[in-house]
Regions:
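HhH-family (HhH-GPD) DNA N-glycosylase catalytic core used in base-excision repair
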Residues: 2-220
Length: 220
């Protein structure tokens, strides 16, 4: 009975480490680093540039509308679920323009859920400070996406990032890609450690491996 609860060491018993992922932390780190090492220089360059380009695009919208860049990034993040990147940017631009013009929220079309549009609208109404903007996003993936674009030491875990860590191709409609809070945090830690080993920011490593994984498997 105790063997299932404790690990025995030469110095006594200690509680077993709880595992919230389907592979160990060590294997997840190894899988992530292996995908990075299999990436071409073109894929590495594209991944390294992705989030900086995203911040530059957000900065352009911020300048256009005289809006703090972190507010624009928060709006982009709020509108990101199930949204293509180019359309995500256009939706953010349109929503901000409509808000400034005094249009009703309902008249502005976006390509995501209504509740996400309402969340973005609330951020525009309140113009909160940086930390409050993150709190208002209130969703692990969209908050994480905000942090990545803003350049924090962070990584967003989507279905592809999960598959890379497990070295397993699972479709994004599979229930296994619905990642709970504990699994999400554990996968983030795997990317953090792999990124430290490779002298990268975690979001850079994710973008590189995401690009390489999708190209490897022909994912559009």
């Amino acid at each position: 009975m105790l063997a299932s609860i404790f690990n025995f060491t030469g110095q006594g018993f200690k509680p077993m480490e709880k595992v919230y992922t389907q592979v160990s932390h060590k294997i997840a780190v190894k899988n992530i680093k292996a995908m990075f090492k299999a990436s071409s220089q073109t894929q590495i360059n594209a991944g390294m540039a992705w989030y900086q380009n995203a911040q530059d695009q957000a900065q352009a919208i911020a300048i256009k509308h005289d809006m703090p860049v972190y507010i624009v990034v928060a709006v982009i993040a709020a509108l990101s679920p199930n949204n293509k990147w180019a359309r995500n940017l256009q939706n953010a631009d349109d929503l901000i323009a409509g808000f400034i013009a005094g249009d009703a929220m309902e008249t502005i079309k976006v390509s995501t859920y209504h509740k996400m549009k309402a969340k973005a609208w609330s951020i525009l109404q309140d113009i909160p400070d940086y930390d409050t903007a993150k709190t208002m996003l209130n969703g692990q993936k969209i908050t994480s996406f905000f942090m990545d674009i803003m350049g924090e030491f962070n990584v967003t875990i989507d279905g592809h990032a999960r598959n890379i860590a497990y070295n397993e191709r699972v479709g994004l409609t599979d229930d296994r890609t619905n990642i709970g809070v504990r699994e999400y945090r554990a996968l983030q830690e795997a990317y953090y450690d792999a990124a430290r080993d490779l002298d990268l920011m975690p979001y850079q490593l994710q973008a590189i491996t995401w690009t390489a994984w999708r190209e490897l498997h022909g994912i559009v």
